[in-house]
Amino acid sequence: MVSSDTGECFSGATVRVPADLADALKQQALEQGFALAGIAAVPSGERIAMRTAALQRWLAAGHQADMAWMQDPRRQAIELLLPGVQSVLAVALNYYVDQQQTPASPKIARYGWGRDYHRVMDQRLRRLGRWLEEQQPSCRWRACVDSAPLMDKAWAEEAGLGWIGKNGNLISPSHGSWLLLGHLLTTASLPADQPARSLCGHCQRCLPACPTAAITEPFVVDSRRCIAFHTIENRDEQVPLPLHGWVAGCDVCQEVCPWNQHHAQSSADPAVQPREWILSSTVNEMASWSDDTWSERLQASALRRIKPWMWRRNLADLG
């Protein structure tokens, strides 16, 4: 291994024909539990350049709020993440489960209902990297979940998994946008899939549905107005806007999307099944948690990014 999330391929296995290897790699991804898998080539086409320019405009406008890591230069130059990268395997984990929280429960975004997806996806991507080691000698790879400085939605779009919608989420025609994205960068040269094309059409349901008007125009989300940002990332003692019942994240712009209303598929993956307390706990119950209870309830959860004092802050806003 090169580092904690990279690998070098020194297997003496027979080199496969690139097209066969690409198909086999994507099949392996599906067998690991990913709902979608596709491959993009590096250097990329005009679309990645367009998405990079859009990111630069977004940053220049200050829409990242205080998320300084969004300015990491590696996000705009994939070669800095893995020198010599030629291909990107993009994968998507379907996290939608056809269950609902009780009306009395503080609202928690669905991505946080199950186990920490960073760990789940990283483990599965590493297995794919090790499998790739066995197939092609002398290649290098790096696994990336959304904590890596990568334009994950742009590369997933380039690999054909879906298109970036007007709410900023990647939308798949087969699954909607209830998807978590991961990538395996590799120096192996693999044939690319056809990039996805947008199917949003004239629909703009997500824009007026946002309770804080965070989607300032199609495809532009201002984090300074976003409930998800303020509940998860804002470290101030008070949040500057109403949370509208949300204590962790926000799913409104996804809930109103027709692609989710008509194409969401309930996942049976054990990693994304909801914890019982998420579905049924009340504001008063959550507000009474000690730090130890918080640690127990959120063990191996992506919601641990919301510290205990932030959790109480968010709950206090709900009254």
Swiss-Prot record:
GO CC annotation terms, alphabetical: cytoplasm
Required cofactor(s): cob(II)alamin; [4Fe-4S] cluster
Family annotation (InterPro entries): 4Fe4S_Fe-S-bd, 4Fe4S_Fe_S_CS, QueG, QueG_DUF1730
GO annotation, biological process: queuosine biosynthetic process; tRNA modification
Annotated pathway: tRNA modification; tRNA-queuosine biosynthesis
Cofactor note: Binds 2 [4Fe-4S] clusters per monomer.
The UniProt record lists the keyword Iron-sulfur: yes
Gene3D superfamilies from the UniProt entry: 3.30.70.20
Active site, per annotation: 146
Domain of life: Bacteria
EC code: 1.17.99.6
Domain 4Fe-4S ferredoxin-type, residue spans: 188-220
Residues annotated to bind [4Fe-4S] cluster 1: 200, 203, 206, 257
Key words of the record: 4Fe-4S, Cytoplasm, Iron, Iron-sulfur, Metal-binding, Oxidoreductase, Queuosine biosynthesis, tRNA processing
Reaction(s) catalysed (UniProt annotation): epoxyqueuosine(34) in tRNA + AH2 = queuosine(34) in tRNA + A + H2O
Subcellular location: Cytoplasm
UniProt: [4Fe-4S] cluster 2 binding residues: 210, 226, 250, 253
Record-level Gene Ontology MF annotations: 4 iron, 4 sulfur cluster binding; epoxyqueuosine reductase activity; metal ion binding
Keyword presence, Iron-sulfur: yes
HAMAP family: QueG (MF_00916)
Alphabetical list of PANTHER family matching this protein: EPOXYQUEUOSINE REDUCTASE
Function: Catalyzes the conversion of epoxyqueuosine (oQ) to queuosine (Q), which is a hypermodified base found in the wobble positions of tRNA(Asp), tRNA(Asn), tRNA(His) and tRNA(Tyr).
Assembly and oligomerization: Monomer.
Stated family: Belongs to the QueG family.
NCBIfam families referenced in this protein's UniProt entry, alphabetically: tRNA epoxyqueuosine(34) reductase QueG
Protein name per Swiss-Prot or TrEMBL: Epoxyqueuosine reductase
Organism: Synechococcus sp. (strain RCC307)
